[in-house]
Amino acid sequence: DYQAVPSRANLIYNSAFLRHDESRRRNFLEAVNKGEKKINSSTLYPHEIVAGYNVNTSAKCNPNLEALWKNLPDTVKGAENVIVVADGSGSMGHRIANGSARALDVANALAIYFAERSVGQFHDKYITFSNRPQLVDLSKGNGTLASKIRIALRHNEVANTNIEAVFDLILKTAVQHHLLPEELPGTILILSDMEFDICACDNHSCYCLQPNLFEVIGKRYEDAGYRLPRLAFWNILSRSNTIPIKQNEMGVALISGFSTAAVDMVLSNKLDPYECLIETITRDRYKPIILPATKPKTVVKVRKK
């Protein structure tokens, strides 16, 4: 029964299933993609499935990877929109945690994952990591994960990002389309292999993020009737000995380094450092161990005559 196969086995052993049981496996995957059956992908992460395509722009659609992607758990269901700013520069090609996935796989996977779950005007969209950021429309493909990866790869750019321009792009989109406040992203998530810096320079100019910039941008949003999205910056390839998440003096959530805990935190959109700390230390694994009560031993003293 292929519906009982564990998540990771579905990802790793699909070639073996096709080699030894091709007809039944293909029929099962076809039924899954039609919504008639379920495939188990509950313990997989988005980047693991994207990495299965080897990030090849000419990759053919893989029914197994498509089925696993469609059946990923929705960790943000009912929550606010999250829009990703994805770094596609060459340095993002480094592998993460000695695994097969790359930082680029993480960025593209989360950009697609959150874009699919956003509602309204920002559905199926993410933003390029650029000094002239633009909205990428993933719906221009045929709807498959493979086509969305190809679209993302075509928009890779080697540049620093202009954070003010990102906020302005979102506000401009909201005003142009007369969006309701709840249709705007609640969080802007920047995925990169760079350290967060208030100043960024390229070959042409330098751009500095001033401490009062959020006040200026916030006023623009307020004047238009909107709430300013919060900003989170994840340095996926950080090798510094910093704590996993902290908040700087401008209120930006800074996530450092790659781990499954960091992925869980980002997918749940719980980016408040204090909340993350409390959630971590209150998990079952850290609860005190209570040993069963035992009766005290009776000591018998023998006196010599």
Would you name each region that the model predicts?
Residues 1-106, 116-305:
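Long lumenal/extracellular ectodomains of secretory and single-pass membrane proteins
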